[in-house]
Amino acid sequence: MAAGSGGGTVGLVLPRVASLSGLDGAPTVPEGSDKALMHLGDPPRRCDTHPDGTSSAAAALVLRRIDVHPLLTGLGRGRQTVSLRNGHLVATANRAILSRRRSRLTRGRSFTSHLITSCPRLDDHQHRHPTRCRAEHAGCTVATCIPNAHDPAPGHQTPRWGPFRLKPAYTRI
């Protein structure tokens, strides 16, 4: 998510948002953890139309809360700053902050992070668990399927995180 930064993973899951695209060439959500979708440094991606025919601009921006603990493996130190401006996803990372959060988590405390939902149509290889989530289902979170906010797909398991919370277009992890 940070232009020029490499390695690491982010505590974000993106199964639906107005648009999945970076501003100023900034890459979008990285893959590398069970709950992240793209590698740092990947080029921006965009989805203009969802499978149900609704436009990206009309798609709801929904944020959930999640325990960050499973996302810290391989993360190293870092902070992700994510913002949505004019329907575009932008993220920057500076590798400094999570080291002290990690020590708290290892003592059994939980730290919650926001998840931003996004376009459900990503590459098939990003659906890591096809037995639990078919690629045509909107709202796949890769590690754990979360029903779409508007029309839950049959067969999706109940969300582990919730409830849905509408937030401003800026959140810091």
UniProtKB/Swiss-Prot annotation:
Recorded superkingdom: Bacteria
Induction record: Present in mid-exponential phase cells.
Miscellaneous information on this protein: Gene Rv1954A is encoded entirely within Rv1954c (this gene), on the opposite strand.
Full protein name: Uncharacterized protein Rv1954c
Source species of the chain: Mycobacterium tuberculosis (strain ATCC 25618 / H37Rv)
